[in-house]
């Protein structure tokens, strides 16, 4: 039950990250994922898995190409936190190499 709650939390942020071009909104959405995926408590573990299962990793990796430093910084920190999960770390590497 709790795991589905985290999917519902993640989806709006991923929607914003994939459909928005406003740098402030992108920075805020990436920052939210960054904060939610930090630490080792169970909800953060679930958030990291939810971002992966909702195909959010390629969205975040693509945003590293933006020319707005504060967006890139927020995205990079979110990816760092998501990479605490070993499977995410592997996928982030694969996605980056394939781009």
Features from the language model and the residues they span:
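N-terminal alpha-helical segment
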Residues: 9-10, 43-44, 56
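Leucine-rich repeat
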Residues: 14, 45-46
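Buried hydrophobic core positions in alpha-solenoid tandem helical repeats
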Residues: 12-15, 59-61, 98-99
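Alpha-helical solenoid repeats of the armadillo/HEAT superfamily
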Residues: 1-8, 20-38, 50-54, 65-84, ...
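Short, solvent-exposed loop/turn at the beta-strand->alpha-helix junction
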Residues: 41-45, 84-85
């Amino acid at each position: 039950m709790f795991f589905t709650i985290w999917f519902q939390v993640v989806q709006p942020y991923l929607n914003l990250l994939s459909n928005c071009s406003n740098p402030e909104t992108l920075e805020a959405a990436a920052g939210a994922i960054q904060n939610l995926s930090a630490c080792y408590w169970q909800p953060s573990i679930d958030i990291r898995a939810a971002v992966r299962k909702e195909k959010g990793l390629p969205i975040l990796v693509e945003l590293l190409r933006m020319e707005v430093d504060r967006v890139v910084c927020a995205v990079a920190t979110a990816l760092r936190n998501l990479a605490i999960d070993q499977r995410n770390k592997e996928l982030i590497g694969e996605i980056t190499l394939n781009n």
